[in-house]
Amino acid sequence: MARRSEIEAALRRLAPKIPPHEFSAVVDHALDSAGLRTASPENAAWLSLVSYLRHAFTDYEELLTQGYDRDSARFFVADEMRAMLEQWGVQRKLGTDD
């Protein structure tokens, strides 16, 4: 099975209600990220999903520009991310390291 197919299958299991456009963007992010090349398909799908949500659907980057450190910015967007994960049918809980 090709890497793309493995990540797609992992993402479908992880986020069964994710919209098609978002699905493609998350898979592309997982494949394009140098840091995820050696990750298991499941970890690549999860880490890419979390990163995509944080950057595309929250004020995370704005908080960083306002001078918040990474951990503080992540704290302030966590509830918004949890709500989106729930909408997309994700059962896995967002951890403090995510």
Feature map (PLM): residue ranges:
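Structure-specific DNA junction-binding interface
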Residues: 1-98
